[in-house]
């Protein structure tokens, strides 16, 4: 992320992403969602999304069968299938989810960005 993009995040979330001591993972579900948005003209990327994620030093977290199964069994607080996969990943992998989407709160996962 560049400085202007980090400034749009909450201060704690931006600081966590900028801190090189942290391992930052991007869900394969997020990459899929971004690719769909690019394909329909909602986002522009000058290079492949995976290459951009890796250039930032982030790791890609694959979606597993366990993630998908867990996502399918989640309560319907949030209906977006991509976000449900990300919630399941955060839960099963015991990761902190960086998000500014308040619809993630009812799932009891650790979040950063909703301060």
Regions found by a protein language model. Name each.
Residues 1-2, 37-38, 74-75, 89:
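A generic structural signal for short
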Residues 1-26, 39-51, 93, 102-106, ...:
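Short, well-structured N-terminal submotif of metal-dependent ribonuclease cores
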Residues 34:
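Phosphate/NTP-binding elements of NTP-utilizing enzymes
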Residues 44-46, 50, 55-103, 114-115:
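Active-site neighborhoods of divalent-metal-dependent phosphate/nucleic-acid chemistry enzymes
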């Amino acid at each position: 992320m560049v400085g202007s993009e980090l400034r749009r995040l909450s201060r704690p979330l931006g600081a966590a992403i900028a801190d090189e001591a942290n391992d930052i993972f991007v869900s394969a579900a997020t990459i899929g969602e971004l690719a769909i948005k690019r394909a329909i003209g909602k986002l522009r990327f000058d290079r492949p999304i995976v290459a951009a994620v890796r250039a930032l030093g982030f790791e890609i977290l694959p979606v597993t069968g366990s993630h998908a199964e867990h996502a399918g069994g989640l309560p319907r607080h949030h209906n977006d299938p991509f976000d449900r996969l990300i919630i399941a990943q955060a839960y099963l992998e015991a990761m902190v989810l960086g998000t500014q989407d308040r619809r993630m709160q009812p799932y009891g996962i650790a979040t950063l960005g909703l301060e």
